[in-house]
From Swiss-Prot:
Induction: By nutritional state, up-regulated by fasting, fluid deprivation and insulin-induced hypoglycemia. Orexin-A immunoreactivity varies diurnally and peaks during the dark phase, in the pons and the location of locus coeruleus. InterPro entries: Orexin. It comes from Rattus norvegicus. Residues 97-130 form a propeptide. Belongs to the orexin family. The modification Methionine amide is found at residue 96. Neuropeptides that play a significant role in the regulation of food intake and sleep-wakefulness, possibly by coordinating the complex behavioral and physiologic responses of these complementary homeostatic functions. A broader role in the homeostatic regulation of energy metabolism, autonomic function, hormonal balance and the regulation of body fluids, is also suggested. A modulation effect on luteinizing hormone-releasing hormone (LHRH) secretion also suggests a more minor contribution to the regulation of reproductive function. It holds the Pfam family Orexin. Residues 1-32 form the signal peptide. This is Hypocretin neuropeptide precursor. Mainly expressed in the brain, with expression in neurons in the dorsal lateral hypothalamic area (at protein level). Produced by a small group of neurons restricted to the lateral and posterior hypothalamus and perifornical areas. Positive neurons project widely throughout the entire neuroaxis. Particularly abundant projections in the cerebral cortex, olfactory bulb, hippocampus, amygdala, septum, diagonal band of Broca, bed nucleus of the stria terminalis, thalamus, anterior and posterior hypothalamus, midbrain, brainstem, and spinal cord. GO terms for cellular component: neuronal dense core vesicle lumen; perinuclear region of cytoplasm; postsynapse; rough endoplasmic reticulum; secretory granule.
Length: 130
């Protein structure tokens, strides 16, 4: 079975190259999109922007973005939330250190009293009482 031969005129090929080549060359010369002001000044969360425009495997980062859970909030994160939230900022900031220390205490034993629980209950808590 013989297929009819089709010859493409050089004018059509030239026209196609003239239409497609300049945009392709221009797209190579264009720099990456500039970083938004909020990301440059670190005033907002730019995790998605960094995933899209940063180095590395973008697909893996984007696919796992929703599955990631942030680690335990540090003092810096809690201080930031206290300053940005409504309410009594001074009370929250003044008690923040005490709450951080309280989180480090071990949980009491389940069931009846264990020897460490009674020793902890009888030991005085830190700080002077005036």
């Amino acid at each position: 079975m013989n297929l009819p031969s089709t010859k493409v005129p050089w004018a059509a090929v030239t026209l196609l190259l003239l239409l497609l080549l300049p945009p392709a060359l221009l797209s190579l010369g264009v720099d990456a999109q500039p970083l938004p002001d909020c990301c440059r000044q670190k005033t907002c969360s730019c995790r998605l922007y960094e995933l899209l425009h940063g180095a590395g495997n973008h697909a893996a980062g984007i696919l796992t973005l929703g599955k990631r859970r942030p680690g335990p909030p540090g003092l810096q994160g809690r201080l930031q939330r206290l300053l940005q939230a409504n309410g009594n900022h001074a009370a929250g900031i003044l008690t923040m250190g005490r709450r951080a220390g309280a989180e480090l205490e071990p949980y009491p034993c389940p069931g009846r009293r264990c020897p460490t629980a009674t020793a902890t209950a009888l030991a005085p808590r830190g700080g002077s009482r005036v």
